[in-house]
Design a protein with these regions (language model features):
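A short acidic, often aromatic-flanked loop/helix-cap motif at beta-alpha or helix-coil junctions
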Residues: 1-5, 120-123
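Caspase-like (clan CD) cysteine peptidase catalytic core
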Residues: 2-29, 33-95, 156-158
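Active-site-proximal C-terminal subdomain of hydrolase catalytic domains
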Residues: 67, 75-171
Length: 171
């Protein structure tokens, strides 16, 4: 599955089929892990369903690989949403959320990642309607609750601003 995931990223998203004005949204729900490198730095991974724990290095996908793929895409906006334990190691903080900032930011290229938990956090699997708490709240946000300024658009910044406190309130 690792190879299929990476092939889909490279063959369908990081090639000429994705144009400079496109927007890409990628959602992953599954397992994640953190490994400490020899340097002492932690590295986050997503773990495909068919991964063998004995073959972690070749079966898991490092968050740095995902960041590199996102940077290689021509698309104007790329957002990865990760519902996995320890996925926060792929996270970079966003900036201010004023509406003028958001309008200006929409004109620029952006790479964003929203994660279910921090670098050292496990996340709850059991939530409403058979989803994890994170995914359930994410679906509510995408259905409209995440449009915090009421302009009819849900930005990555608005999504994060809605999801984080809503997940905390539910879990």
């Amino acid at each position: 599955t690792r190879n299929n995931i990476l092939a889909a990223f490279h063959d369908r998203l990081a090639d000429d089929r994705t144009g400079k004005n496109d927007r890409v949204f990628v959602f992953f729900a599954g397992h994640g892990a953190t490994r400490q490198l020899a340097s002492g730095r932690d590295l986050g991974y997503i773990i495909p369903v068919d991964s063998d724990p004995k073959e972690f290095a070749t079966d898991a996908i490092a968050m740095t690989d995902i960041q590199n793929i996102a940077e290689s895409m021509q698309a104007k906006h790329v957002m990865f949403v990760m519902d996995a334990c320890y996925s926060g190691l792929g996270l970079t903080r966003g900036g201010p959320s004023s509406s003028s900032f958001l309008r200006e930011n929409a004109r620029r290229s952006a790479r964003q990642m929203l994660t279910a938990g921090g670098a050292d956090q496990q996340v709850a699997d059991a939530g409403p309607n058979g989803h994890s708490v994170f995914t359930w709240v994410l679906l509510q946000a995408l259905a409209g609750k995440g449009d915090l300024n009421g302009d009819g658009l849900i930005t990555g910044t608005e999504l994060a601003a809605y999801v984080a406190p809503a997940v905390s309130a539910v879990s």
